[in-house]
Amino acid sequence: MASGGSGGVSVPALWSEVNRYGQNGDFTRALKTVNKILQINKDDVTALHCKVVCLIQNGSFKEALNVINTHTKVLANNSLSFEKAYCEYRLNRIENALKTIESANQQTDKLKELYGQVLYRLERYDECLAVYRDLVRNSQDDYDEERKTNLSAVVAAQSNWEKVVPENLGLQEGTHELCYNAACALIGQGQLSQAMKILQKAEDLCRRSLSEDSDGTEEDPQAELAIIHGQMAYILQLQGRTEEALQLYNQIIKLKPTDVGLLAVIANNIITINKDQNVFDSKKKVKLTNAEGVEFKLSKKQLQAIEFNKALLAMYTNQAEQCRKISASLQSQSPEHLLPVLIQAAQLCREKQHTKAIELLQEFSDQHPENAAEIKLTMAQLKISQGNISKACLILRSIEELKHKPGMVSALVTMYSHEEDIDSAIEVFTQAIQWYQNHQPKSSAHLSLIREAANFKLKYGRKKEAISDLEQLWKQNPKDIHTLAQLISAYSLVDPEKAKALSKHLPSSDSMSLKVDVEALENSPGATYIRKKGGKVAGDSQPKEQGQGDLKKKKKKKKGKLPKNYDPKVTPDPERWLPMRERSYYRGRKKGKKKDQIGKGTQGATAGASSELDASKTVSSPPTSPRPGSAATASASTSNIIPPRHQKPAGAPATKKKQQQKKKKGGKGGW
């Protein structure tokens, strides 16, 4: 073996060492030996190539790229396009990697593999799908399973981010990775129950494969399963089972997986569950979305969703400037996106600046007419919250693509009815019916609108206007007796002769299968429980004077106990129910008898109160003109001294005891 200082070792011997170290996977020692060869011949192309490979194997991508860029002239004939592109890819210089691959002299299989990865990172899924299809079709080696996994990942990405219906590529779900990607594709199509079943299958396959792998550590199964469990929790969240989803999310976070992308997505989903509640927990979780390298692990739409939720969290926590800063940044990145401007408008509304919010929305609507419908709906909602119903109706009627929809017609008619603008409500009906007449005549929505318009006009006494609608409905269905009856009723006030003529179309009672026995109906006694609604007749209670019910009442009525000193010969005082001060014979107290009647007066008189009223105590007594609330409300004011956590109900014994003690202190006249 050549030592570091032995300069006499031959180059072939050094190459033998490099070969041996490479076969053993000891690329650190192989790199040292290659450097010795380069000291002998610094322009040795093979040695430079080996050095780049050793650096890549050791994860030193920057240093490997520097070697390639430094020796560009020497390596011109021996192209290292793959190594250079791979270093750029691992350093997240994706655009540079794409240029390197496209400028390569020869497109080898390994370059195509890398090309597919680069296209996937750039989210150019259609091109990526074509590359992987070609690789799966034309490659025959031990990496076929990995290529199929990558192919299924592209299909899942298209389904989720581009809402493309995935085509059946005939991929067998033989591994947990393939099952996981298939489930992701189903989630993008909204097939949540089926996706959950496939994820459960992926979990079983993952546990089985990891148990068979003797080289894996105990942390490997948990790391692999965390991704599957995270997707299961997401399905539970979409199904509205937020408690189960939250529990599963927190279990994954406790495992502390090393995948920063997974942690960021889970933290973001927890924040969406918390919304404006539990913001302290959301503030802790949002730190996970700021981890280093997250931007390279997630797609653009995932990163955008995280930023949206950061802006909303800032709004919920009253960080107005932070909210505006994030939403403005999002708007600059995606000027046509709705959410940033909606968040800004919501923040302005929280600050009671509704007018500015409406102006902001109107400006966005003018700049992006393709999104005007959603913006105008929000503007109308703000106008309604301000109580300006008429203006809200005008905004809603300006949405051309929605003004004929039954839901919009219903909302407009309701608001116009609230404003008592019946003419405008009828105009809304007329315009909607005319649209369906031109585009979808005789459709269910068309006939439903005509019927609702007729009912509305009849409700507000517009019988003449309702006649044309009812006639149109009756012509569509001459057997509709209900519509015919409405039409006859309307004509009876406008044209009695026409009403009489139409009444001939009504079926006779014999032809109607009502199955009513007229004689039985006339002979029936009628309602038998009418008396329940009113009071009982006096005579009804007489037969029950000695019945069982009366005995029960006698048992309930117990005679009250008489006082011990009760004298039946003495007539009770007729004014005994009045307070003493309001009785006719009350003359007030005589002077000089206060001390003798302590404890004999009305409730609430104490020694403290009597001492405060004693004018003989001039030195230690409080001022004769008490401050408001210091005399009659003395007990109430002192109770406020007790801290909130020690407060007890006013009727509690401890409170009364404390009040009495304080009143006794007051009797001494001290401050």
Swiss-Prot record:
Region Disordered: start-end pairs: 527-671
Pfam families reported for this sequence: SRP72, SRP_TPR_like, TPR_8
Region (RNA-binding): 545-617
Gene Ontology cellular component terms for the protein in this record: cytosol; endoplasmic reticulum; signal recognition particle, endoplasmic reticulum targeting
Origin: domain of life: Eukaryota
Cross-link (Glycyl lysine isopeptide (Lys-Gly) (interchain with G-Cter in SUMO2)): K391
Residue positions, PTM Blocked amino end (Ala): A2
Compartments where found: Cytoplasm; Endoplasmic reticulum
Keyword Transport: no
Region named Required for interaction with SRP68: 9-163
TPR repeats: 11-44, 109-142, 226-259, 406-439, 447-480
Keywords: Acetylation, Cytoplasm, Endoplasmic reticulum, Isopeptide bond, Phosphoprotein, Repeat, Ribonucleoprotein, Signal recognition particle, TPR repeat, Ubl conjugation
N-acetylalanine modified-residue sites: A2
Annotated spans, Required for the interaction with the SRP68/7SL RNA complex: 379-509
Biased composition range(s): Basic and acidic residues: 564-585
PANTHER family in alphabetical order: SIGNAL RECOGNITION PARTICLE 72, SIGNAL RECOGNITION PARTICLE SUBUNIT SRP72
Similarity field: Belongs to the SRP72 family.
Protein name: Signal recognition particle subunit SRP72
Organism of this sequence: Canis lupus familiaris (Dog)
